[in-house]
Amino acid sequence: MKSRAAVAFAPGKPLEIVEIDVAPPKKGEVLIKVTHTGVCHTDAFTLSGDDPEGVFPVVLGHEGAGVVVEVGEGVTSVKPGDHVIPLYTAECGECEFCRSGKTNLCVAVRETQGKGLMPDGTTRFSYNGQPLYHYMGCSTFSEYTVVAEVSLAKINPEANHEHVCLLGCGVTTGIGAVHNTAKVQPGDSVAVFGLGAIGLAVVQGARQAKAGRIIAIDTNPKKFELARRFGATDCINPNDYDKPIKDVLLDINKWGIDHTFECIGNVNVMRAALESAHRGWGQSVIIGVAGSGQEISTRPFQLVTGRVWKGSAFGGVKGRSQLPGMVEDAMKGDIDLEPFVTHTMSLDEINDAFDLMHEGKSIRTVIRY
């Protein structure tokens, strides 16, 4: 079938809006019509050429919502007409990782997904007879996309796709990191480095967890109003100080902050976040994705004296079994999604959405098909 899509033909180049061919779903696969998709920093990271798994030409996009059109052989968990959110972190329930109960990092389709391919090692997309790669198992920058059954969360059909599509990545990643990775407790102190969608979601999650002091940190003070709305008690611009941000936080509590979250992908900030964590028990959670080849460092004494350095992917959330409940929470108002959507655009305007993001003028732009 034909589908309009925003295709990245080469790194560092604007996306091109073209009509592509989408093949029917094969065994264990599902064809969906995407209704809405967010434009995320991870899409921009891959488009920049810095992503070690980046392959081109590719249909980007991984933060979407849509409706099932057709199912392949053996698919039982969804049917045509079901409303779904594609998942870049699958949940098969059968691999060693799923069975462990310790992680959400399912490996059922990981090997092929990282190569831009479907589980059978081929692609369902083509343009002028030439194959196009998939992206993170989702490719939501196409009006129609094919996704593995294990990479789909079935959601309430009454949910507002313009809002809940954000649960496909950014908001879930931030809120989940608070509850699942850090396990923030009532009264704990929290510092959030970077107030994009993920960082703001961490702030909201910290408020849900009844954290005592929630410190929001960004060099763009325009982000502070929304951070306060989501629950920040303090907003700090590092540019307002003539000393490292670590020292600013240690002035707040000389022993450090109970939980720090790095939501940028800057290895220097990752170190500052760790070294701002509380001596004896502080945790620092890395959420931001650093560029290819970059490494983190600190003095071992930081860890010897009780700090813990952790990472979080998709907030530790198991997509098929847990994400539908988060959609219900959003519908009840327990998760506030609307403020994240600062702009809505058509697919033809998608390059403008990337520009807004790079200029710091948007939190999330949602593309409506």
From Swiss-Prot:
Q: By its UniProt entry, which Pfam families does this protein fall under?
A: ADH_N, ADH_zinc_N
Report the co-factor binding details: Binds 2 Zn(2+) ions per subunit.
Ligand binding (Zn(2+) 1)? 40, 62, 169
Q: PROSITE patterns recorded for this chain?
A: ADH_ZINC
Any idea which positions bind Zn(2+) 2? 92, 95, 98, 106
Q: Which reaction(s) does the protein catalyse, per the Swiss-Prot or TrEMBL entry?
A: S-(hydroxymethyl)glutathione + NADP(+) = S-formylglutathione + NADPH + H(+); S-(hydroxymethyl)glutathione + NAD(+) = S-formylglutathione + NADH + H(+); a primary alcohol + NAD(+) = an aldehyde + NADH + H(+); a secondary alcohol + NAD(+) = a ketone + NADH + H(+)
Give any single GO term for biological process: formaldehyde catabolic process
* Cellular component aspect of the GO annotation: cytosol
Q: What is its main location?
A: cytoplasm
Write out the annotated subcellular location.
Answer: Cytoplasm
User: InterPro entries annotated for this entry?
Assistant: ADH-like_C (IPR013149), ADH-like_N (IPR013154), ADH_3 (IPR014183), ADH_Zn_CS (IPR002328), GroES-like_sf (IPR011032), NAD(P)-bd_dom_sf (IPR036291), PKS_ER (IPR020843)
What is the recorded function of this protein according to its Swiss-Prot or TrEMBL entry? Has high formaldehyde dehydrogenase activity in the presence of glutathione and catalyzes the oxidation of normal alcohols in a reaction that is not GSH-dependent. In addition, hemithiolacetals other than those formed from GSH, including omega-thiol fatty acids, also are substrates. Also acts as a S-nitroso-glutathione reductase by catalyzing the NADH-dependent reduction of S-nitrosoglutathione.
Official protein name in the record? S-(hydroxymethyl)glutathione dehydrogenase
**Organism in which the protein naturally occurs:** Escherichia coli O1:K1 / APEC
